[in-house]
């Protein structure tokens, strides 16, 4: 039997209205009616009496109701258990593009290197904006978030992983801020509070991106400057700090749900340094 038919039956019996059941199930009213007819044909009985807007369960419908509830409950439990089994070795890590490019890519390599060959995890490296990742974490669609700003929510656990240094870089030596176009690389909401004082309140970015690789590649073309992690920029080469600029220290946090069933695993993974240089 198609569980969607039982699901539709339960929703109509709950709302006693085909239109409201359709809205709740994100279906058309005709689709709901069709499903109920299918179920009635399979069982060989009428499940509802229909008189204008007055929809009631028949005696057969009343008898089916507890069985339908039990079947759907069992089906949901089975789906959850199977999904949990299939996800047992999966672990999702979310961060912005710039964090993956500048530091987390190397950490991911270290995680794989330190895995037991027989119990190795299947990692998912997820790239998205911080706000989206916080939502995914809250909804249990993400296991671990790496970010520069810890969300102030009681249900989250956090661990400070260390700090990294940002400097303002351009593609040629001996350049001043006034000679360059500004490329905004997103380093978290609180970074924008410092940005105006470090760049200039009237400075309008010629480009905004969440990718350090993209920003770095566009610096020369756009005669620009952007904030990049010092350790990453040194490895890249061909980059020079802007003469009349300063540096800025940024924290890096690991965030996860307090009641996550992967708490012990998360703490083990975080024993492997996320940053190449921790201070």
Curated annotation (Swiss-Prot):
Residues 1-58 form the HTH lysR-type domain. Residues 18-37 bind DNA. The keyword DNA-binding applies. One of its GO terms (molecular function) is DNA-binding transcription factor activity. PROSITE patterns: HTH_LYSR. Keywords: DNA-binding, Repressor, Transcription, Transcription regulation. It holds the Pfam family LysR_substrate. One of its GO terms (biological process) is negative regulation of DNA-templated transcription. Negatively regulates the transcription of the flagellar master operon flhDC by binding to the upstream region of the operon. Belongs to the LysR transcriptional regulatory family. This is HTH-type transcriptional regulator HdfR. It comes from Escherichia coli O17:K52:H18 (strain UMN026 / ExPEC). The gene is hdfR.
């Amino acid at each position: 039997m198609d569980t969607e038919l039982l699901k539709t039956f339960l929703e109509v019996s709950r709302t006693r209205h085909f239109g409201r059941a359709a809205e709740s199930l994100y279906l058309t009213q005709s689709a709901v009616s069709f499903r109920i007819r299918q179920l009635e044909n399979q069982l060989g009985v009428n499940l509802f009496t229909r008189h204008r807007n007055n929809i009631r369960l028949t005696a057969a419908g009343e008898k089916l109701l507890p069985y339908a509830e039990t079947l759907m409950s069992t089906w949901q439990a089975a789906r959850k258990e199977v999904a949990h089994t299939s996800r047992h070795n999966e672990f999702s890590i979310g961060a912005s593009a710039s964090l993956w490019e500048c530091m987390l890519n190397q950490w991911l390599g270290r995680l794989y290197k330190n895995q037991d060959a027989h119990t190795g995890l299947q990692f998912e490296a997820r790239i998205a904006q911080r706000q989206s990742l916080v939502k995914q974490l809250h909804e249990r669609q993400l296991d671990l978030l790496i970010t520069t700003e810890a969300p102030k929510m009681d249900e989250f656990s956090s661990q400070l992983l260390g700090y990294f240094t940002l400097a303002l870089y351009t593609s040629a030596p001996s350049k001043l801020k006034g000679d360059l176009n500004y490329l905004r690389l997103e380093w978290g909401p609180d970074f924008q509070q410092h940005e105006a004082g470090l760049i200039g309140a009237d400075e309008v970015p010629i480009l905004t991106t969440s990718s350090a690789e993209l920003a770095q590649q566009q610096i020369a073309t756009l005669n620009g400057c952007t904030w990049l992690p010092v350790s990453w920029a040194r490895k890249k080469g061909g980059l020079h700090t802007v003469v009349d600029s300063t540096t800025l220290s940024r924290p890096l946090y690991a965030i996860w749900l307090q009641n996550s069933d992967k708490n012990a695993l998360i703490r083990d993974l975080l024993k492997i340094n996320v940053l190449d240089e921790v201070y």
